[in-house]
């Protein structure tokens, strides 16, 4: 039987996160962190935001060793690991989705990524379901940066991103000839190849959403009980590490200031999500710079 107390003890295990469940941060901070990076950088600012759809907060124990063998086993921290590398240079934080307690929203994909990209929780008509599209009051960080002259890109697999959630913003970018581009892919490997192209190109802000943890969770279960879910998270960590390697291979890398963001839109329990329980609400956020420095 699931125990909330045990779940909190797991994610609070010393060594995994830089904060605790009691000091968790809202996913809405992501937009502010990215914009602050572009404002404050003394070199040419760049940012990649790698989304791991459906990756639970406690999945970080598969990648980062804790001081408690009952939590992370006797495994060492993954070597060729994006999460480990980003944590070492910045931090790995417990975060939460699904709105505040007095104004909850669905812990699902549309609400999750939109809240992260817009920097605020969804308005009442958008708190549930998918039949809505962001309006002028909810510009994403991509739109804000492209209007400032930066080139931005959004790469994803789920059709609803393009048909509903970001449709208004896609139309706005096309009408106003903004350097804001959207790419619809079919698989995680296609998405990886697309992100490599973006990294090797001239984009300033790159956002992409991998789907495997969420798909495995819906098919056979979120969490430790489904080895396919575990392997989905671990495989994404390796793919993300390869993306970081591609960034360092850029001929202009030394003249650039890259912020790496890795995060999730929601967790999951059984074969679903969307509720306000801790497994659905609690997520992770990895930043290549300490959050305190970014928010000064």
Give short role names for the model-derived ranges.
Residues 2-296:
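Feature captures the catalytic ectodomains and active-site-proximal regions of enzymes
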């Amino acid at each position: 039987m699931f125990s909330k107390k045990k779940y909190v003890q797991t994610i609070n295990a010393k060594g995994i996160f830089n904060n605790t469940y009691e000091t968790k941060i809202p996913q809405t901070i992501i937009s502010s962190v990215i914009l602050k990076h572009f404002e404050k950088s003394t070199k040419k600012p760049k940012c990649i935001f790698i989304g791991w759809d459906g990756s639970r907060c406690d999945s970080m124990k598969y990648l980062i060793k804790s001081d408690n063998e009952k939590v992370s086993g006797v495994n060492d921290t993954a070597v060729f690991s994006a999460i480990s590398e980003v944590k070492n240079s910045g931090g790995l934080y417990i975060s939460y989705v699904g709105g505040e307690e007095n104004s909850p929203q669905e812990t699902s994909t549309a609400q999750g990524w939109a809240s992260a990209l817009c920097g605020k929780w969804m308005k009442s008509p958008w708190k549930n379901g998918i039949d809505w599209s962001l309006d002028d009051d909810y510009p994403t960080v991509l739109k804000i940066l492209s209007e400032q002259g930066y080139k931005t890109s959004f790469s994803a697999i789920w059709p609803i991103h393009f048909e509903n959630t970001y449709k208004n913003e896609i139309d706005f970018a096309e009408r106003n000839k903004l350097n804001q581009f959207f790419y619809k892919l079919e698989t995680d490997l296609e998405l990886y190849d697309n992100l490599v192209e973006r990294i090797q190109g001239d984009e300033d802000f790159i956002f992409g959403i991998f789907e495997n943890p969420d798909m495995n969770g819906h098919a056979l279960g979120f969490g430790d009980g489904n080895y396919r879910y575990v392997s989905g998270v671990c495989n994404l960590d390796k793919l993300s590490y390869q993306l970081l390697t591609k960034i360092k291979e850029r001929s202009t890398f030394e003249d650039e200031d890259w912020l790496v963001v890795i995060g999730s839109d929601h967790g999951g329990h059984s074969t679903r999500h969307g509720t306000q329980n801790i497994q659905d609400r609690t997520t992770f956020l990895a930043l290549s710079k300490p959050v305190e420095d970014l928010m000064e």
